Amino acid sequence: GLIVLGLVAAAFWGGASLDGVRPSLEIIAPAVDLSPPGAPLMLPFLFITIACGAISGFHCLVASGTTSKQVRNETDALPIGYGAMVTEGFLAVLVIFACVAGLGLGVTDASGEELTGVAAWSDRYASWGTAGGLGSKVAAFVDGASNLLAAMAIPPSVAIALMGVLVASFAGTTLD
């Protein structure tokens, strides 16, 4: 919970380093790219994306054996499912922000060169092929979110470790 609050603070205030110099935090992703090379059609994925929050809220309610045992009656399930859905949507917005603004603060490419701004975005998302695969998606989130935490004077190695633990925790709770 504290890590998520830190990401929210970094998103709204842009972080503040110990030396008083604030990093330039800007969204470097293009607003619209209607035809990325090699991308599948958007139509079926759009409905899956929109339904994901509602499904996750319902899944949070019924998939955990503890939640169903804690509600007094069926009407208590409505605010729990809705709250889980809203929380899931908020988390999705934080992840998007970390991947589009956090990457711009700097990433290291395969050759070891430090990239910032649009060059960092292009390194990760230049084509559908470079953005594909679970490893590149997790790396984009970990790098972007750790950059946001590093902007708040948290050492980069600690920020990367925290984000790695966060990703592992999400994976672990998903398997439950």
Task: Name these PLM-found stretches.
Residues G83, L148-V158:
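Transmembrane-helix boundary/entry motifs in multi-pass membrane transporters
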Residues G1, F58-A92:
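Hydrophobic, small-residue-rich membrane helices and short re-entrant helix-turn-helix hairpins
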Residues A84-M85, C99-L103, L162-S169:
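A glycine-rich phosphate-binding loop feature that marks nucleotide/adenosyl-phosphate handling sites
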Residues V4-L7, S56, T87-V95, L175:
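Alpha-helical transmembrane segments of multipass membrane proteins
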Residues A11-V32, V86-D143:
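Extracellular/periplasmic helix-exit of transmembrane alpha-helices
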Residues C52-V71, T130-G133, K137, F141, ...:
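Membrane-helix boundary/coupling elements in multi-pass transport proteins
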Residues G1-S56:
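Helix-loop-helix junctions that connect adjacent transmembrane segments
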Residues I50-G53, G81-E88, S169:
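Transmembrane helix-bundle signature of multi-pass membrane transporters/permeases
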